[in-house]
Amino acid sequence: MQAKSSRLWEDTVNLMPHLRQKWQLSNQNERKKSMIIVESHRKKPETLRKAYPDALILDVTSHATGALRKLSPFYPHMGIPIPFTPGMTAASVEGIWQGLKTFEKADIDLDVMRNTTMKDLKRTVRRFGAPKGHRKGVHGTELLGYLTARWEIYLPTYKWVLENKCQMQIDLLRRESEKRTVVLLDYEINGDINDPRKPLSHAQLVKMYCEGNYPV
């Protein structure tokens, strides 16, 4: 299973330039009236109910209750393959993303990748100094820039989780979105993969996956 996962990583990365172009084209042609909408978790409940009176409003953040909490990148599913690192797995998507970061004063952090608490996963510039890039695998020598890391590390990792750990949640969202509007609440709402100014919304990735428009 570990070797199979590693091959899947390599196949996905080799297709990356084509996938980026494909995503950009399909994103431009995305249907205008989507039944899944992403909104800010910071909006007041009454504001959301007024804007979407007949919608099913769902929290998909790490603070959610029930099964939808598993859609959070912070959730410790365990056994998630670490990109470009055959035979090694981590607890969460966020743990991989943060753990592979390198800084002026710190290299990668395996403890962050093993963290199952959903807390203390963030690695900050204030503590570790200027960022140098994401290491391309635990034992890699190459450092990836922010957007490249987003495409080659974050997106494939989160997709693996959706396909291997969250199919029940995805099936539920697809069924409900066929009947009525579904609003997903996230703390971030940026769905532009190529915009480095804001963190990427995982709720937007869930929406894309449900609609068959996932970037990779």
Predicted regions and their residues:
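N-terminal amphipathic/basic-hydrophobic helices that include classical n-h-c signal peptides
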Residues: 1-31
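Charged, low-complexity intrinsically disordered segments
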Residues: 19, 23, 29-216
